[in-house]
Amino acid sequence: MISDDKGLRAAMHATRLAFLAAGFVMACWAPLIPFAKQHVGADEGVFGLLLLCLGLGAIVAMPLTGYLSARTGARAMILLGGFGLVAFLPLVVIAPTVWTLGLALAVFGAALGTIDVAMNIHAAEVETRAARPMMSGFHAMWSVGGILGAGGLTALLSAGLSPLGAALVGSALAGCAMILAAPRLLRQSGGAKPEFVRPRGIVLLLAILAAISFLVEGAVLDWGALLIVDQGLMAATGAGIGYMLFSIAMTIARLTGDWLVAALGRGRIMILGGLVAMAGIALTLVPGMLWPALLGFALIGLGCANLVPVLFSLAAQSRDMPPGLAVAAVTTTGYAGILLGPALIGFAADATSLAMAFGALALLMAAFPLAAQRASRIG
């Protein structure tokens, strides 16, 4: 029993390291984007297509990861994805042509999709063995990694280090985290019958909710600063503060999320999270007032923070599909939301206004309190 407890604690730490490393590497890419664009001489339109390669690589890899994890367990896929990110971060900086950058980004995205699905499958298994909520804490480490990665790479570049040098430092740090995690990950045997990961049963509802939550997160990332400028609340140079407050609030909420889930239950977290996010969206649309808008972005982060971790936990407990396949299905559908959502917001904003398009997100978030009872009734 003592050995089992030690093994479980080690697996918890390894899972946190995997989330930290993945969030760190992904955030390291953000400050390197302008340098990669300049290196290949791509204009905005071409570079937009190149960034789409990253997303498509992730989308393709996710269901395949669920399939393979069902056969062999998540450990091998976590290591494949994690070390793939470590290897390809420097390569996306030095890719000499548009075509090689597109290929490198597709592989980088595939590695991201692989570790994203696999570490959530592993996290669900650890949570099940621990018999207590842990998913929000794991996702908090992704958020912490994101803050460290973006801040660290920005500091290195500002200090005069070359883009390749900064990328190599980021890869080395993430690689160390993966090396520490590797021997402590659960050695699951898999054994579930592999099958196509089309969501079905309650997993379909969870997947739709994940797509909505990811869509809102993507909208805040891609359109939040533009909304602040469009509303005449702040100049473009400072408009990124909205997303910063969103990210900080989300990280804080996830660090306390496991305690909240244990105290309130997953259904109440979905209800409260949806309502808080709806209130936040409404505040961002108050005309001519900056502080309500900034408070609104923070509330969106607080509300959305624990929704996706709860959905992943519920997917892993569903009897409609094997846990690994269910998590893969929810993750893949969620990423479709974050990829397609911002584009849909753009189309809606063009047809109406950005404020109206943002307001429509509140209507979508109403799905969480409305569906909470059904979605959280697993069994």
Q: Which stretches of residues belong to each language-model region?
A:
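Conserved MFS/SLC helix-loop-helix module at the cytosolic interface between two early adjacent transmembrane helices
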Residues: 60-95, 99
